């Protein structure tokens, strides 16, 4: 059994170490005996398919470069992949890029890939800090750092914000889930702090490729204890305000 992870624009969109998510996916899959190949794809490169598609975050200029290449050369392929149940994880700038459009800090409206049912606009202040999100799978923790304000035009939110700002600081929603794709502002890296979410992505990819999947549990006891302690402290801090 094997999976191929395609890491899009790894050289342009990795300001916040989001490639750690690819490393975590690879590690947790390989611990179950699943061989993983990571293919890095940037401007001018090609790919035909993937089992998991990943895109991280970056600065406005690099994001615009990636957007121009994606809209011109890849948008239809990626859209077809997601509509067919392909698994994707898109973080921060990658989340914005996969939407219908985003407005950058200079007020320029940039066309997105129109893969996820969202749009984004630059805000007046930066949302920076820890974030806790209630999801049906697990309570997620991460770190947000974004000027963008994202609004859902369909799909469902990744979860409800319990601490932090999330998509736009107004509706208490964070991220989006559309079919087997997730868009989110959560760094961390996200999957290192939330192993159940990581395993869910692996499981979805395996089911799509092989028809079924049973993942043997891994020992995440220490990670989960640290996560629970963090959640407790942050919610206590929030309640004291």
Residue ranges of predicted features:
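N-terminal beta1-alpha1 cap of cysteine-dependent amidohydrolase-like domains
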Residues: 1-80, 192-241
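A structural micro-motif
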Residues: 3, 36, 86, 111, ...
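A residue-level signal for conserved active-site and pocket-lining positions in enzyme catalytic cores
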Residues: 5, 113, 145
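A secondary-structure boundary/capping signal
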Residues: 9, 91-93, 116, 146, ...
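Structural motif
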Residues: 52-56, 89, 183-185
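Cysteine-nucleophile active-site neighborhood
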Residues: 60-137
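Amide-donor transfer/coupling interface in amidating biosynthetic enzymes
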Residues: 122-241
């Amino acid at each position: 059994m094997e999976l191929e992870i395609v890491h899009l624009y790894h050289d342009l969109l990795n300001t916040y170490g989001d490639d750690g998510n690819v490393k975590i996916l690879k590690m947790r899959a390989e611990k179950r005996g699943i061989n993983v190949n990571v293919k890095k794809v940037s401007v001018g490169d090609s790919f035909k398919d993937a089992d998991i598609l990943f895109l991280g975050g970056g600065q406005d200029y690099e994001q615009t470069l990636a957007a121009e290449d994606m809209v011109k050369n890849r948008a239809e392929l990626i859209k077809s992949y997601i509509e067919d149940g392909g698994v994707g994880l898109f973080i921060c700038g990658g989340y914005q890029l996969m939407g219908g459009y985003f407005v950058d800090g200079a007020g320029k409206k940039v066309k997105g890939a129109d893969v996820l049912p969202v749009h984004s606009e630059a805000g007046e202040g930066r949302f920076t800090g820890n974030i806790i999100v209630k999801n049906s799978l697990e309570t997620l923790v991460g770190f947000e750092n974004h000027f963008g304000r994202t609004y859902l035009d369909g799909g469902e939110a990744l979860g409800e914000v319990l601490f932090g700002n999330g998509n736009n600081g107004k509706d208490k929603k964070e991220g989006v889930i559309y079919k087997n794709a997730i868009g989110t502002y959560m760094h961390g890296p996200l999957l290192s702090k939330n192993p159940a979410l990581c395993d869910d992505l692996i499981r979805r990819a395996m089911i799509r490729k092989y028809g079924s999947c049973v993942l043997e549990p891994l020992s995440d006891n220490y990670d989960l204890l640290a996560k629970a302690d963090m959640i407790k402290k942050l919610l206590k801090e929030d309640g004291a305000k």
